[in-house]
Amino acid sequence: MTLRKILALTCLLLPMMASAHQFETGQRVPPIGITDRGELVLDKDQFSYKTWNSAQLVGKVRVLQHIAGRTSAKEKNATLIEAIKSAKLPHDRYQTTTIVNTDDAIPGSGMFVRSSLESNKKLYPWSQFIVDSNG
């Protein structure tokens, strides 16, 4: 076998050995926490942040998305968000949790990303927005 064939075969088989997650059917997902910013809280038109941990996600069906703090990432998820909105799911049994990685934003745009999240929080106060500035 030539070096080229060995390299090609390795490149084809290597992704099969990698695992993007370690989820197991019937088991809880290991909790993660975000302490640098955390959950965006709106209280009487004032915004603040509190430490967030996924162990708090009990009692509701959820869609959890972890996206980059870029417009392109928001656009890629727009179809999903529109489908969720049009489904008119009950807020007492369903919640969307969005973790935004502002570390993956265009340098200097973190302030604009947070401003956009604040606008969305005002529009959809029942949704959770988590700011992760450490990636």
Model regions: which residues?
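Short, flexible, glycine/charge-rich loop motifs used to bind or transfer phosphoryl groups or to couple energy/partner
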Residues: 22, 51-54, 86-87
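A short beta-strand-turn-helix
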Residues: 32-61
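Hydrophobic h-region of N-terminal signal peptides that target proteins for export
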Residues: 11-20
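Thiol/disulfide oxidoreductase modules built on the thioredoxin-like
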Residues: 131-135
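Bacterial N-terminal signal peptides that target proteins for export
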Residues: 1-7
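Structural micro-motif
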Residues: 124-128
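Structural microenvironment flanking redox-active thiols in thiol-disulfide oxidoreductases
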Residues: 58-60, 66-122
